[in-house]
Amino acid sequence: MIENDNTFNKDEWEIIEKNYRKGGFSKISKAKKKNGIINGTIVNKKMIAIKKIKFDDKIQFNEVNNLELIKNKNKEMQISSIIDYFGYGIKGKNKLYIYLEFIEGKTIYELKKKKFPLNEKQISIILKKCLETMKFLHNNCNLIHMDLKCDNIILKPNNYDNNNNNNNNNNNNNNNNNNNSNINDDNNNSNSNINDDNNFDIKIIDYGLSQKIGDLKRDHYGTYLPDECILNNVSIVNYTFDVYSLGFISFELFYPTQFEIKPIKLTHIYEYVEKSQISPLFLNFIKKCIGRYLDIDVLEIHPFLNENYDNFENYFKFLKQTPLKRIKYRNGINGENDILRINNSTTITSEQFPNNSKMIEFGDDFNGIINVDYIANKKVVILNNPNYNIINLDFCFSNVEYICIKGIGVLEISKITHNSLETFIYEGEFKNDFILKPYLFTNTKHLILKNYKNYIRHRGIIPEGVTFLELSDSIGIEVIKTFIHLPKSIEELCFGCTEETLKQIERNLILQSINFFIINGKLMKFSKNNNLEYYE
């Protein structure tokens, strides 16, 4: 609820501390409303953060609109990491004042400057709370934060409110200098309280750059966004922007000093994090965020974020089922209205296809001709019959991001030359002398070739960027010896072989960057003696 008169009147406020925090576009002061009421909401003597922004045509009320939306959506959800919003005021032609909940605590950036250490358990708690907030923003508000970073995450000890209220009651007559001293003392105390692992909460702040999923990307963007976003190779806002940012936040949380991460190639990022002294599970989580091929539902159950670190089996069972779920999530495919199923042989023209359908599935009994126009604008395509007649196959998949092909005849896969496929599942056959060509999967991250058991003859056959690779369930040891040519981006490798072959697999045959293996349907790892063994 916003008052009719939104004029900011300084006389109505008691300024406790002016400009105690500054951002790129704003200054924040600590204050109390003298009459205890803000836009009809009774706040009594509650401390308020007044965010002052000099707005222009590009920023204007974007943050106000986002905060209004988030506030309304959070009434039912009650996500604790969402900051309370009380309205706004305007002064002059270009000064906007936003009234927010004042959070006692320090940003992660401030803690890092003081070289305050965080262990991996504390980091996992922080990241889990971040994911909860991201999931709420994405699913309930249809918003991407766009500027997730350590400076926009405040750590607040859970017992801080009571201590702060007592301090405020005892010190109402203190001057600003005394208040500043108390704040610093309190925050120093808060650092020790954070050591109690789960005895703290987080608040994610600053929604000035947030945008709706599917919007055109604006000129303003946050600190940690993908290279393709900064270099204007992508124009549509999607959830992977926030996931990517979380990967850099994860890495920074481990180190007590602030450093600048400039846009660099993905392979260089992998090499950098692999040299760091962090656990394999934490490293795996970071690489998944930076790789951007998992959605939040999958990241939430990652073993690093859960106390049961050994629960790998359920994690990987879920992982193998996620490609379609992920692409649905990303493209807003929420129900049957978004999915078009063709389950008969009736002749269909492209004009009969609804424009709003985002996914198309051709059933086993469809034996008509599939024209390029049918699937040109679809994000998800599922072909269940190996005998489809597809016209212009080489241009069919220019915009498709997920495809599952049961088979289009031997070698027909080689005709797919222009694609943006992130997830490719192919269950067709390969000739014995067939060699994969890297141009087939230039943008693919999740690659499943269920019948491929030929040699990986040289580096580049599987392109850099693939993170999940599944091959045939009958791989021989000579083919496994060529796995050394797989790209360093691969994190999970899935294949099958005989028990005799399994005994011959040595650590030097598999890239060190591959953390986990699913062999014959079971999760395996190399022991300290470099022998393959099952996870128990």
From Swiss-Prot:
The alphabetical list of record keywords is: ATP-binding, Kinase, Magnesium, Metal-binding, Nucleotide-binding, Serine/threonine-protein kinase, Transferase
Give one Pfam hit by family name: Pkinase
Domain called Protein kinase: residue spans: 14-305
Which InterPro entries would you find in this protein's record? Answer: Kinase-like_dom_sf, Prot_kinase_dom, Ser/Thr_kinase_AS, Ser_Thr_kinase
Q: Which organism is it from?
A: Dictyostelium discoideum (Social amoeba)
Q: Which PANTHER family match?
A: MITOGEN-ACTIVATED KINASE KINASE KINASE (PTHR24361)
Q: Where does ATP bind?
A: 20-28, 51
Keyword Magnesium attributed: yes
Question: Which molecular function terms from Gene Ontology are attached?
Answer: ATP binding; metal ion binding; protein serine kinase activity; protein serine/threonine kinase activity
Name of protein = Probable serine/threonine-protein kinase DDB_G0268550
Q: Which residues cross the membrane?
A: none
Recorded E.C. number(s)?
A: 2.7.11.1
| GO CC entries | cytoplasm
